[in-house]
Structures are given as structure tokens and as C-alpha cells.
Amino acid sequence: MTKAKYKILVCPSDRTGVSKFRSVDPHIRLQEMFPEDFWIDIDYAPKCEDENFFKQYDLVQFHRSIGPDFAKSQKAIEICKKLGIPTVCDIDDYWMPTVDHPAHAIVKENKLDHMITESLKIAGHITTTTKVFAQEIKKLNPNVFVLPNTVNPRERQFQPKKIDSKVMRIGWLGGSSHLKDLEIL
């Protein structure tokens, strides 16, 4: 096998939810579709302080931070900048959750909102879910691109189950952090 043209490091924030749909699945699909052009490494605990580790990559994509430690993540972003490696921070939820959000207390106690804000400021580029959210993020960093949320309709869990009925059914997909959103419906 010849060397792929672009080697991308993907650093998901978790092993479910947002990481599956916005980090892991899209990059695996990219490599499947264009194996001669892209090689994807998925790393949940990258060596954030190792300059040589990052030298092997052409781009680093992460969700909120490169690994779980925000301070090390900021150092990693600076290493990438020094090496000329583009960084792309993906964010799908507002970093300052309202008091009715299940994680509000944890976010505030651990100052995660501040740490996410700092990641957004220093990242080379940012991807997010909507134009409205992009406008908010542009207050911190002008290099924002919208990649709407999506799922793979071929996955078994998203296959429709035909039911012979005259009743219209509407599906909704979201995590517990979006329960308040259901009140709008």
C-alpha cells in the first residue's frame, strides 16, 4: 500500500454520542471512500506534549479539546501551530449550558465553559452544527464552518420499521442534555 496523501489525527471526546457522529464515523468513512488520499488515526488519549508524535500528521481534528486535559490540549494546539499542522475543533453544543441542563453544575464547578472558550480561541479552524451557532462562535474565532449533524441512514438503528397504520409518527434523536428542547415540540 502506498502512503496516503494526508494523515489525520482524530481526537474524540468520548466513545459515544457526539464523538461517534461528528468525529469517528465521518473520518472512517472518509478513509473508506478515499483510501489512497487519507489515513485516519483515532486516538482518545494522544501524547499531547510530544512534538514528535504530532509531526506525523497533516491535520488534527478534536472535539472541544485534544484529550481530556484542557491545559495539555492547549499545549498540543500550540505545538501543532509551531509545526504548521492545521487544527480543527468541532463543537456541537453551547459551552455555557443553562441551569436546566443536566451538566450545568459540573461545567461551572470545573470551569469547563472557560476551558472550551480558550480552545475555541486558539484552534486554527472550528466546525459546528448550525449557522446560528457559527455566528456565536465567530465572536471568538472567525474560522468557523458549518457541518450539520447527520446520521448514517444505513445503520440498523436508523432503519424504519414499517407499521401498517394511518397514524403519523415523528422520530426525534438527542441525548439527555436536549430534554428541555422537547418542550418546544
Where are these regions (language model features)?
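Conserved catalytic-core segment of nucleotide-activated headgroup transferases in glycan assembly
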Residues: V10-M33, W39, N152-L185
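Donor nucleotide-sugar binding/catalytic pocket of nucleotide-sugar-dependent glycosyltransferases
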Residues: K121-F158
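Membrane-proximal helix-turn-helix segments that form the acceptor-binding/catalytic region
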Residues: A76-K82, I106-H125
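Acceptor-binding helix/loop patch of EC 2.4 sugar-transfer enzymes
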Residues: H27, V88-T117, R154-Q157, D164-K166, ...
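Structural motif
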Residues: D58-L59, P86, H125
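Short catalytic/ligand-binding loop motif for oxyanion handling, primarily in non-cytosolic enzymes
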Residues: G17-S19, E51, P68-F70, W95-V99, ...
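An aromatic- and histidine-rich active-site surface loop
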Residues: R64-K82, L173, L182
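N-terminal pre-catalytic "stem/leader" segment of glycosyltransferase-like enzymes
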Residues: M1-G67
